[in-house]
Curated annotation (Swiss-Prot):
It comes from Photobacterium profundum (strain SS9). GO terms for biological process: mRNA catabolic process; RNA processing. Involved in mRNA degradation. Catalyzes the phosphorolysis of single-stranded polyribonucleotides processively in the 3'- to 5'-direction. PANTHER family: POLYRIBONUCLEOTIDE NUCLEOTIDYLTRANSFERASE, POLYRIBONUCLEOTIDE NUCLEOTIDYLTRANSFERASE 1, MITOCHONDRIAL. Its cofactor is Mg(2+). It is an enzyme of class 2 (transferase). This is Polyribonucleotide nucleotidyltransferase.
């Protein structure tokens, strides 16, 4: 074993890349570390593609091992299971910048497996994993047009910070990940606190500039490893056949793309393709149908892009900067806590907001530590939304990714738990889709939260931008359709308020996207966003003054922390009885803050009254109404407040002599008692006869013996 090691400084971090020791049967493998966070990445590529396969089967698996943090997994089996949401999102983060760097004709299966094997709680594994993946692909010999770099950018005290620690991120107004090659940005994923377009663009440029250190280091690493390149060349395109396909289909496809209704257009395009394939096969039976259909797809892309570059109206008849027709409705579901129906052209989202208590918060236990999430956003993309049948089950990677993007867009305007002590769950059901459903979810979420009475800081809208670039000519498109996303060169999603950007996601399929093009896209997106916000504000300009009658109302009270044990009771008996008998949910914090959630005001008031009673201090000399809890030979134990009991001695039951306690008292009987004394051990001495004397002094005086 001859290890090859490359060490370099990346901002404040030391990065080490190593190969040649582990997984030597894989196509390539790299162990990478960044300040005690280590990840092992393997790459395996198949030497031959499956015959007839028309897609690139790239799979990225990212897995966090609990041993990396010195932990043992929970659960019965005590081993890692299916990928968590965080692992799925990181896998997508790795996949997005590397996928466009493989040749479009390359169809061999490639699998990337990244395993986190050691973790420093201050250094998130995602950046070093992206760097390690880039290094592994660079030394694999695969036809990969990399390497790529990766950088996380923070914004603290109006200064950009490279790869901030997790502690620094808590103070940052920006969490932006940018990845690209030496000359081009390929991918951006970010969450921001209403920052300007200029600041966001500067952050992207800053991150791309800083990661050049990584790209140079990987190039040096790959040169030292010196793996021979694969003997792979792209298949030769049959130019004569391509011309025949274009001759038969180009004009018809151009006409079909003037049909503005999606399903009618799809039917016509499908019919044209079938006709052309049948015609060519009739002329020559030796032709390959799959090859013909591939050529038709390429022609379709060329036709649509050519129309856009030439300045013709877009597929649905719009100009380049027009937003589709909007329809905004709130309160569409009677029993949900908040709801909205947001429609933009042929994209529609039914969004609901549900309020719960802090007990409903999601506990996220990862190798980076445990945390609670009080804002949940789930995105569902059923097959019927695109007029198809399909499997319905657990969320796919795309649904998890789109839900996270929508959540990023809203997070900056959500109130803190102190301001609004609820757990909020939003569900976006995509009921129709023709592009930009994640941004429709952002708009629908903002509306549903306002309908639910959640005091968000401002309305949020999202817009998806596209790009078609041919040579030096380019057109930036606002509010792209699904076809424009598929046939274009860039998917650029921006969410924000009137004041600034809250989320930015960018996936670029080609090189040569300049800073100027990104600036145009951001400014065009700003105009579209403000237009959508104005329509949304006409429907509901601010949050409702009150929450839904069906939502739990949370009442907060404070008790002395010494009294917490009294409210909980032995083995939780007191608080369990309180919740069951009042129909409320009660949460107690360590500082004595009690939150009572109830859908009915009377139930909450009763719970508050009983807690106040339980936590009240017993006062010497005060008369209480108590209940006989136990009878003994020398007296009776009577509850004074809640679970607090005191002793009424047999001599304090009545003015006359009492021979037998049970002759005067019964279990459960309510009696008036006066507190005579509380000793050092907290024992309470009570008197029934003193209570009677205090309440009826004249009568008692008459009954006193005369001397």
């Amino acid at each position: 074993m001859n290890p090859i090691v490359k060490t370099f400084q990346y901002g404040n971090h030391t990065v080490t890349l190593e190969t040649g020791v582990m997984a030597r049967q894989a196509t390539a493998a790299v162990m990478a570390s960044m300040d005690d966070t280590s990840v092992f990445v393997s790459v395996v590529g198949k030497k031959a593609a499956v015959e007839g396969q028309d897609f690139f089967p790239l799979t990225v698996n990212y897995q966090e091992r609990t041993y990396a943090a010195g932990k043992i997994p929970g659960g019965f089996f005590k081993r890692e299971g299916r990928p968590s949401e965080g692992e799925t999102l990181t896998a997508r983060l790795i996949d997005r910048p590397i996928r466009p760097l493989f040749p479009s004709a390359f169809k061999n299966e490639v699998q990337v497996i990244a395993t986190v094997v050691s973790v420093n709680p201050e250094v998130n594994p995602d950046m070093i994993t992206m760097i390690a993946t880039s290094a592994a692909l660079a030394i694999s010999g695969l036809p990969f047009n990399g390497p790529i770099g990766a950088a996380r950018v923070g914004f603290i005290n109006d200064q950009f910070v490279l790869n901030p620690s997790n502690t620094e991120l808590e103070e940052s107004r920006l969490d932006l990940v940018v990845s690209g090659t030496k000359d081009a940005v390929l991918m951006v994923e970010s969450e921001a606190d209403r920052l300007s377009e200029e600041t966001m663009l500067q952050a992207v440029v800053y991150g791309h500039d800083q990661q050049q250190v990584v790209i140079n280091a990987i190039n040096e690493f790959a040169a030292e490893v010196a793996t021979p390149a694969w003997d792979w060349t792209a298949p030769v395109v049959n130019a004569e056949l391509k011309a025949r396909v274009a001759d038969k289909a180009a004009t018809r496809l151009s006409d079909a793309y003037q049909i503005t209704e999606k399903m009618a257009r799809y039917d016509e395009v499908g019919s044209i393709k079938n006709d052309v394939v049948a015609s060519l096969l009739a002329e020559d039976e030796t032709l390959d149908e799959r090859e013909l259909r591939g050529m038709l797809s390429s022609l379709e892309k060329h036709v649509v892009r050519g129309r856009i570059i030439a300045g013709h109206p877009r597929i649905d008849g719009r100009e380049k900067d027009m937003v589709r027709a909007l329809d905004v409705r709130t309160g569409v579901l009677p029993r949900t806590h908040g709801s909205s129906l947001f429609t933009r052209g042929e994209t529609q989202a039914l969004v609901t907001a549900t309020l719960g208590t802090q007990r409903d918060a999601q506990i996220i236990d990862s190798i980076m530590g445990e945390k609670k999430d009080h804002f949940l956003l789930h995105y569902n993309f059923p097959p019927y939304c695109v007029g198809e049948t399909g499997f319905v089950g657990s969320p796919k990677r795309r649904e998890i990714g789109h839900g996270k993007l929508a959540k990023r867009g809203i997070a900056a305007v959500m109130p803190s738990v102190e301001e609004f002590p609820y757990t909020v769950r939003v569900v976006s059901e995509i009921t129709e889709s023709n592009g930009s459903s994640s941004m429709a979810s952002v708009c629908g979420t903002s509306l549903a939260l306002m309908d639910a009475g959640v005091p968000i800081k401002a309305s949020v809208a999202g817009i998806a931008m596209g790009l078609v670039k041919e040579g030096d000519d380019f057109v930036v498109l606002s509010d792209i359709l699904g076809d424009e996303d598929h046939l274009g060169d860039m998917d650029f999603k921006v969410a924000g308020t009137d004041d600034g950007i809250t989320a930015l996601q960018m996936d670029i399929k080609i090189e040569g996207i300049t800073k100027e093009i990104m600036q145009i896209a951001l400014n065009q997106a700003k105009g579209a966003r403000k237009h959508i916000l104005s329509v949304m504000d006409d429907a509901i300009g601010t949050h409702r003054d009150d929450i839904s009658q069906f939502a739990p109302r949370i009442h907060t009270m404070k008790i002395n922390s010494d009294k917490i044990k009294d409210v909980i009771g032995k083995g939780g008996a007191v608080i369990r009885a309180l919740t069951e008998e009042t129909g409320t949910t009660i949460e107690i914090e360590d500082d004595g803050t009690i939150k009572i959630a109830a859908t009915e005001g009377a139930a909450a008031k009763e719970a508050i009254r009983r807690i106040e009673e339980i936590t009240a201090d017993v006062e010497v000399g005060r008369i209480y109404t108590g209940k006989v809890m136990r009878i003994v030979d020398f007296g009776a134990f009577v509850s004074v407040i809640g679970a607090k009991e005191g002793l009424v001695h047999i001599s304090q039951i009545a003015q006359e002599r009492v021979e037998k306690v049970s002759d005067h008292l019964q279990m459960g009987q309510e009696v008036q008692v006066k507190v005579l004394e509380i000793d050092r051990q907290g024992r309470i001495r009570l008197s029934m006869k003193e209570a009677v004397a205090d309440q009826n002094p004249a009568t008692v005086q008459d009954e006193q013996p005369q001397g």
